[in-house]
Amino acid sequence: MKITDILTYAAAGILAVSSQAKDVHSPDGRFAVRAEATISLIDSSGNQILTLVRDTSGDAKVEVAWSPDSRHVVVVENGERVGSGIVAAWKDEVWHKTIESESQEGALIQAQQAKFHGRLVAEHRKLDGWKSPSEVLVQGDMTFSSGGNYHYGYTLAFRQVPGRLDRGGYEEGQLIGKDYHSL
């Protein structure tokens, strides 16, 4: 695990950390995301509520963003080599966890591979602040084997709809990418 500098974006409510025992507290101070060998949601006493990510060994950077109302949190994992993943949690009466579906970005990747005449070789994303208490802005970069690069952005929105649990305990269909655009 590479140790990255801690970068605070106070206005956006975003903190980038290495996975070395860093707690990123919610604005109300009642919860935190703890990044260690795993990424967990904890309460103010340090008791684990949810495991968001079971293994951070391939992560170069973990970025955490709490919504201003402390009811939503988004975590971006950027790998040391190729890609990134986004997991999140939200609270109604209890905490739930969800994951951004890879199929959502699949059409974008296929279109850009055709445009740049090469396969995707690297992809990284970062958070760009909260648009609303349940929508966060995301920016991404794709690099293709042809040498081309594509910079893009989109909105990641929480949806409160009945879903099903996948094998990892994530509620599917709760985190939706929309408004994809070039930067």
Model-inferred region functions:
Residues M1-A10:
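Bacterial N-terminal signal peptides that target proteins for export
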Residues D5, S18-H25, V94-T98, E105-L183:
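Acidic, small-residue rich beta-repeat scaffolds with periodic aromatic anchors
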Residues A10-S19:
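Hydrophobic h-region of N-terminal signal peptides that target proteins for export
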Residues T38-S40, R81-A89, S145-A157:
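Structural motif
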Residues V53-G58:
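Surface loop/turn motifs at the tips and blade-to-blade linkers of beta-strand repeat domains
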